[in-house]
Amino acid sequence: MTIAANSHLSAARTAKNDEFYTQWADIEREVNAYLEFDPDVFRDKVILLPCDDPEWSNFAKFFALHFVDFGLKKLISTSFAPDSNVAGAFYSPTLFETADPKFDASKTRLNGKKFVLERKDLNGDGVVNIDDLEWEYLQGNGDFRSAEVTALRDEADIVITNPPFSLFRPFLTWLFEGRTKFSIIGSGNAVTFKDVFAHVKANRMWKGATGNSSDMVFGVPKGVEIKAADRAKAERLGYPSDEKFDYTRLGNACWWTNLDHGRRHEPLQLMSMADNLKFSRHKDVRGSEYPRYDNFDAIDVSYIDAIPGDYEGTMGVPITFLDKYNPDQFEILSLTQTWSDLAIRKYPSQVLVDADGNRKTVGALNSSPAIKVDAPPLGKSYFEVGGEFFVATYKRILIRRKDA
């Protein structure tokens, strides 16, 4: 094997963030949530599935199967050229392609492919399904940013896919430039990026109905490295390795969408502040006041079910709050990042003291919500700033009741 080929293979084996194949059950659950809210959500629509070769992708197979049920007008799927993809080291064309007169041994590696299903029974079997797909090679490699795939985006009413995780942010920008509806899979932690958060705050996108705060299983190409614990968890969830894929799991994967669903309109059932302090199931909430931040005018709420329903001020809540967020109940104000316009204090350089007493000068406190304490906590990390002591919490979303 040449040095270049060996390098390509090595890169492919560690491309865990990009080559994730979504399971049929996860697609079905999410799509059903949209249909429950609006049975005609897909009717007479053009759906684009970029990054989804029907030879491998469950997205294309799922929507082809339900083409008539959903009343689709047109289904378009595109795939990325193997030689433009680090996972291409594992690629080999299938019989679906090689048996077709259009097969080109060079283009199969250098060019992307486009698959189209329309309201045409091409094989005369009386139904419109995946057997009626028409395909052709794209002029380019199938990158979603290319002119030809962007033109397909502009033709589509809805884009649905699991984009490469490393390209989630540029893919999201590409979607908003096209002003299309979408449902895509990404990391729940993506909301901590300024550009992503801006869309969430403005109610231009939100979490999907399913897969939140739970494991999602993905297929990966054979030969890609998987942590033993993740492989074992996928097996326990019912996905042992098979002839086609190995399987892994991700605990922070979720759907991001601007398609409406009923679960985002379900109000959180919350206790009052007094009842939380008395009856909360969390020991660190019962009998204590909610701590206030030193650098934001807000109280810290460490658990979603401990949000005081009668509090009228600003609250900092975990980013998993978005799993339960009802835009009719709460307003999203900001995120506790350095770029937040709600910060009321900026700290000079700080000394971070870890649990073992090691000291280091840092600037990290400005990117976290800070709680002032009277004395250094025992056995925990803390910050020193000008003789004052602070502990930092995880990133928080700042919210306020809509009726406050």
Model segments located where?
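Class I S-adenosyl-L-methionine-dependent methyltransferase catalytic core
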Residues: 1-404
